UniProtKB/Swiss-Prot annotation:
There is a cross-link at K31, K320 (Glycyl lysine isopeptide (Lys-Gly) (interchain with G-Cter in ubiquitin)). Changing K31R: Abolishes 'Lys-63'-linked polyubiquitination. The gene is TRAF2. This is TNF receptor-associated factor 2. Gene3D superfamilies: 1.20.5.170, Apoptosis, Tumor Necrosis Factor Receptor Associated Protein 2, Chain A, Zinc/RING finger domain, C3HC4 (zinc finger).
């Protein structure tokens, strides 16, 4: 007899992903790598299939429920019931943890000479190395951890500052541009040499400062001279003849334009009168259009109200349809459950004798060989109407010592409705048979339960651990004689001795 599987308890703790492989100062062995992130294991956990994972990686994988072990699938060693990742069966691998933490490590930061063990790196140096590159939260640039504070205070172009002249907030990169427009920025008068004149008062100073050079008042008619404010009158006296000549020239140039403007004025009056007539016509048209717009707006509002009512009705009907779909879905589930129970009741027997026909044998065996469906459970059967509930479990490509060479057949004690009235542990002789369909050479094996085994105690879960015959029938024997497999089907018979019940 052989037990199928046992699931040890486990727990998970959330930490960080694995250590970078650049940390190790020696050649890295594959057994120290996480099967998920492929980095050095951090707080290793071992799954029931034997693969190791970082605590963080395993928790991430199991966040959506139990999963198939990707490493088993990749290595081609997937095993049904074993290659499953679940929190209840994973456990902390303290031996691997001690090995990993004792590995020699070096700091990966350029220029850092720190050396020690991986455990010392995690507890004393990780995240604290002054030469480690970190991201500046302001400018998003990379700076060394030891220089981060100085960078944030004096060098970061995105650091927050305030103008020392007007106290306006700005970032470091915009200080110079702000000084070009700052109203309090100090300026120096080129005329009188006065310093620290706020920009907002500089133009007032220029108007009153006698030393500032300003354009001549006749610059509009051609004088290009600039003179100090206090010498403006002296300049006008000295340049009186030139200014009069410039003024005369401007007047002579403007005279013909004035005549043209007079003629243009009469044309403009005529155009204005024409435009007034057109405007009156357009006003009448606009009044008509306004009334039409109001009518269309009222129609649109009525349509909008009707649309909202229709939308509310559609939403109400949609909600009812969803409720009906949910109700139909629940009824479908209930119907499927009832159909399954009816099928189980039709297949069940109540005298301790059960014959199980396995159809599509070739296809099911091929699926077992491929590892897709290695085991099949039979319908339940009973020793009596109120007796023990049992089923069979068969591995068409073998299990354990019989894998690949034998047909493995197991007996399973299931949780039944009348277990409280029965005698435990289960102690009835069990006979298992592969029937020769010519009724000559049946393959028979029998055993009496080991009452100390958990397989035969009163079930706590839906079914106990399977127990039976991993070497029940050689595959070669079945293939050599075609009377065991006929019409692509085999028959398994189980007989439970009812003596003493």
């Amino acid at each position: 007899m052989a037990a199928a599987s046992v699931t040890p308890p486990g727990s998970l703790e959330l930490l960080q992903p694995g250590f970078s492989k650049t940390l190790l100062g020696t050649k890295l062995e594959a057994k120290y790598l996480c099967s998920a992130c492929r980095n050095v294991l951090r707080r290793p956990f071992q799954a029931q299939c034997g693969h190791r994972y970082c605590s963080f990686c395993l928790a991430s994988i199991l966040s959506s429920g139990p999963q198939n072990c990707a490493a088993c699938v990749h290595e081609g060693i997937y095993e049904e019931g074993i290659s499953i990742l679940e929190s209840s069966s994973a456990f902390p691998d303290n031996a691997a943890r001690r090995e990993v933490e004792s590995l020699p490590a070096v700091c990966p930061s350029d220029g850092c000479t720190w050396k020690g063990t991986l455990k010392e790196y995690e507890s004393c140096h990780e995240g604290r190395c002054p030469l480690m590159l970190t991201e500046c939260p302001a400018c998003k640039g990379l700076v060394r951890l030891g220089e981060k504070e100085r960078h944030l205070e004096h060098e970061c172009p995105e650091r927050s500052l305030s103008c020392r002249h007007c106290r306006a907030p700005c970032c470091g990169a915009d200080v110079k541009a702000h000084h070009e427009v700052c109203p309090k920025f100090p300026l120096t008068c080129d005329g009188c040499g006065k310093k620290k004149i706020p920009r907002e008062k500089f133009q007032d100073h220029v108007k009153t400062c006698g030393k500032c050079r300003v354009p001549c008042r006749f610059h509009a008619i051609g004088c290009l001279e600039t003179v100090e404010g206090e010498k403006q009158q002296e300049h006008e006296v000295q340049w009186l003849r030139e200014h009069l000549a410039m003024l005369l020239s401007s007047v002579l140039e403007a005279k013909p334009l004035l005549g043209d403007q007079s003629h243009a004025g009469s044309e403009l009056l005529q155009r204005c009168e024409s435009l007034e007539k057109k405007t009156a016509t357009f006003e009448n048209i606009v009044c008509v259009l306004n009334r039409e717009v109001e009518r269309v707006a009222m129609t649109a509002e009525a349509c909008s109200r009707q649309h909202r009512l229709d939308q509310d009705k559609i939403e109400a009907l949609s909600s009812k349809v969803q409720q009906l779909e949910r109700s139909i879905g629940l009824k479908d589930l209930a119907m499927a459950d009832l159909e399954q129970k009816v099928l189980e009741m039709e297949a069940s027997t109540y005298d301790g004798v059960f014959i199980w026909k396995i159809s599509d044998f070739a296809r099911k065996r091929q699926e077992a060989v491929a590892g897709r469906i290695p085991a099949i459970f039979s319908p339940a059967f009973y020793t009596s109407r109120y007796g023990y509930k049992m089923c069979l479990r068969i591995y068409l490509n073998g299990d354990g010592t019989g894998r690949g060479t034998h047909l493995s057949l197991f007996f399973v004690v299931m949780k039944g409705p009348n277990d409280a009235l029965l005698r435990w542990p289960f102690n009835q002789k069990v006979t298992l048979m592969l029937l020769d369909q010519n009724n000559r050479e049946h393959v028979i094996d029998a055993f009496r339960p080991d009452v100390t085994s958990s397989s035969f105690q009163r079930p706590v879960n839906d079914m106990n651990i399977a127990s039976g015959c991993p070497l029940f029938c050689p595959v070669s024997k079945m293939e050599a004689k075609n009377s065991y497999v006929r019409d692509d089907a085999i028959f398994i018979k189980a007989i439970v001795d009812l003596t003493g019940l």
